[in-house]
Amino acid sequence: MATNAKPVYQRILLKLSGEALQGAEGFGIDASVLDRMAQEVKELVELGIQVGVVIGGGNLFRGAGLAQAGMNRVVGDHMGMLATVMNGLAMRDALHRAYVNARLMSAIPLNGVCDNYSWAEAISLLRHNRVVIFAAGTGNPFFTTDSAACLRGIEIEADVVLKATKVDGVYSADPVKNPDATLYEQLTYQDVLEQELKVMDLAAFTLARDHNLPIRVFNMNKPGALRRVVMGENEGTLIAK
């Protein structure tokens, strides 16, 4: 497909999983992956696209296992929120080193570390071409960072949520287990619900559907994929009404 002369989106919400930041490492943050992602975000800013970012925390902390071992779920989720703040600090630093203006906003107050989340301030920053990183999820336990991505996407009136993953999009089945699995180019919200496709948790997905917020799932590990998505190429899977 021919590349459009201009980006097809003006404002996006990029959802990065914590695992994406760990690269080949089993834990933590791979500095080279972080820097590559910062460069890809920089490309979007240079194209005039307004970028909001939500990052997960699974590379640093996973509450599910500890919850099974008896830890209170609320405590585990609070720890997970702090993990996303750590990832957000790392991403903000990588963007600053790439000469990109970026602000980190947290849904839980962490004075002296990052700004408190403010919807109006976030919109203002985006309009001035600042990258805004949203950390600490929704600020509430029992909600995933996918829910946070959809919530922030709706709040900032993003054109789309771009969910960066390790696979090329949404498949009819797990492509690792089933080599015959089909990659979908486009789906409706109803298709995803009826076929019980694994895109996001139900709370996050329903939020996006109810507010007609399109979701595009793509492989962030493919160099240039993010740019191709915003330029309107058929990269990954688009889920819309």
UniProtKB/Swiss-Prot annotation:
UniProtKB keywords: Allosteric enzyme, ATP-binding, Cytoplasm, Kinase, Nucleotide-binding, Pyrimidine biosynthesis, Transferase
UniProt KW Nucleotide-binding keyword: yes
Subcellular location(s) per record: Cytoplasm
Predominant subcellular localization, coarse grouping: cytoplasm
Disulphides: none
Pathway noted in the entry: Pyrimidine metabolism; CTP biosynthesis via de novo pathway; UDP from UMP (UMPK route): step 1/1
Residues given in the record as UMP binding sites: 57, 77, 138-145
GO molecular function, one term: UMP kinase activity
GO annotation, biological process: 'de novo' CTP biosynthetic process; UDP biosynthetic process
Domain of life: Bacteria
SUPFAM superfamilies hit by this protein: Carbamate kinase-like
Location of the region described as Involved in allosteric activation by GTP in the Swiss-Prot/TrEMBL record: 23-28
InterPro entries: AceGlu_kinase-like_sf, Asp/Glu/Uridylate_kinase, Uridylate_kinase, Uridylate_kinase_bac
Annotated catalysed reactions: UMP + ATP = UDP + ADP
Control of this protein's activity: Allosterically activated by GTP. Inhibited by UTP.
Positions of ATP binding: 15-18, 58, 62, 165, 171, 174
A Gene Ontology term for the protein's cellular component: cytosol
EC number: 2.7.4.22
UniProt KW Transferase keyword: yes
Pfam family, one: AA_kinase
Enzyme class: transferase
Role description: Catalyzes the reversible phosphorylation of UMP to UDP.
Family membership: Belongs to the UMP kinase family.
Assembly and interaction partners: Homohexamer.
Protein name: Uridylate kinase
Organism: Yersinia pestis
